[in-house]
Amino acid sequence: MNDAMNYDRAAQSAKLRNAVFKGIVYFFLAIWALIVLFPFYWMILTSIKSYGAYNSEYIPQFITLKPTFENYVDAFTAVPLAKYFVNTLIFTVATTALMLVVIVPAAFAFARLNFRGKNLVFTLFLALMMIPTELVVITNYITITNLELRNTFWGLILPSVTSVFYIYLLKENFEQIPDELYYAAKVDGTSDLKYLLKVTLPICGPTVVTVTILKVIECWNSYVWPRLVTDDPNYFLVSNGIQEIRENGFGRENIPAMMAAVVVISVPLIVLFLVFRKKIMAGVARGGMKG
């Protein structure tokens, strides 16, 4: 009898400790969620404040009683934001597609094929990750200028069609596929390209999707490189448009209109993440496993 009572007390105590622990964890997670989401809230809040109301606030107000959508109109009328949006879409899709054409075969070659100097070449590839981005930007700018590709889509796209990090990530995932599958496919007369398309990519699909989404986000948020190689408005991206809206052509900073533009151009990325979030999580989880 006493043993049963002691067991019940121990079980209740364990449940209580578990509940308290979960409560503490959820409390800190809620605080962290508020910290992460607050910039988005502030961005949306600023976008619906009038220019006068925003500049008259000596103390920032966390709500607005007179919301306005005038800033969204200004964002599209002050600059040709719709055209910049299309340019960004072309740049993002083309760059991501070309990158996949380059990095997928490269990762497969390092993961599955045997050739002389493979380890040395891959080590040199990894060493490239140690080079600061600023140095690469300078070299790329000189190259693109010498090739007379400034103010062209090719000038925007070509420096971004490869990534050592993504090659490394895909290589590690491709190596997780059992060797027996590859040898069996070769016995059946399957070419390396067909094996890559029919076996490797379907198995590692979540990781490929993750790499694709990360590249899309990277291209969509590009700022430094487009500012360097484009001074023709016909090739401006949304990042250029936001900078133009900030000044608005009147020698003043129109922050509410700029925030409205940021909200508009952030929507595609948010939707993309929500649609593919399960694939992204699966790709990240697979990338963290070995063997």
Regions found by a protein language model. Give the residues of each.
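A structural signal for multi-pass alpha-helical bundles of membrane permease subunits
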Residues: D3-D8, S13-R17, F21-G291
